Amino acid sequence: MIKQLDKKALRQKRHLRVRKNVRGTSEKPRLTVFKSQKHIYAQIIDDTKGVTLASASTTQKQLKEKLEKTWDENAAKEVGKLIAEKAKEKGITEIVFDRSGYKYHGKVKALAEAARETGLKF
């Protein structure tokens, strides 16, 4: 049986492997996702400058009030919509998606599809 610590270590290894190839630029920044037990976080990062251009999470007051639960797929969809809206405000239309070693399934997939529906291309 795989312990929780082992699962986390395996995810981090996958993330490092992916990060070797996935880079965000100022023209096409990187959208990265992080999941904790209770919240979902998304950031748009320009790796050449090392700057976070936009961020959204279920810890933000505007989402917390709207959501019943902050850790389910509906919450992930709302975070995806919010991060896409913030990106549009900054003039970002194309991104590189970094799933941070998570499977493209469930919350990560919901966040990505909501961002696509709101207008981000990746």
Curated annotation (Swiss-Prot):
InterPro entries assigned to the protein according to its UniProt record, in alphabetical order: Ribosomal_uL18_bac-type (IPR004389), Ribosomal_uL18_bac/euk (IPR005484)
Keyword entries, A-Z: Ribonucleoprotein, Ribosomal protein, RNA-binding, rRNA-binding
Swiss-Prot/TrEMBL GO biological process terms: translation
SUPFAM superfamilies per record: Translational machinery components
Signal sequence coordinates: none
Presence of the UniProt keyword Ribosomal protein in the record: yes
Keyword Ubl conjugation: no
GO cellular component, one term: cytosolic large ribosomal subunit
Molecular function as annotated in GO: 5S rRNA binding; structural constituent of ribosome
Free-text function comment from the UniProt entry: This is one of the proteins that bind and probably mediate the attachment of the 5S RNA into the large ribosomal subunit, where it forms part of the central protuberance.
Quaternary assembly: Part of the 50S ribosomal subunit; part of the 5S rRNA/L5/L18/L25 subcomplex. Contacts the 5S and 23S rRNAs.
Recorded family membership: Belongs to the universal ribosomal protein uL18 family.
Name by which UniProt lists this protein: Large ribosomal subunit protein uL18
Organism for this UniProt entry: Petrotoga mobilis (strain DSM 10674 / SJ95)
Encoding gene, per UniProt annotation: rplR
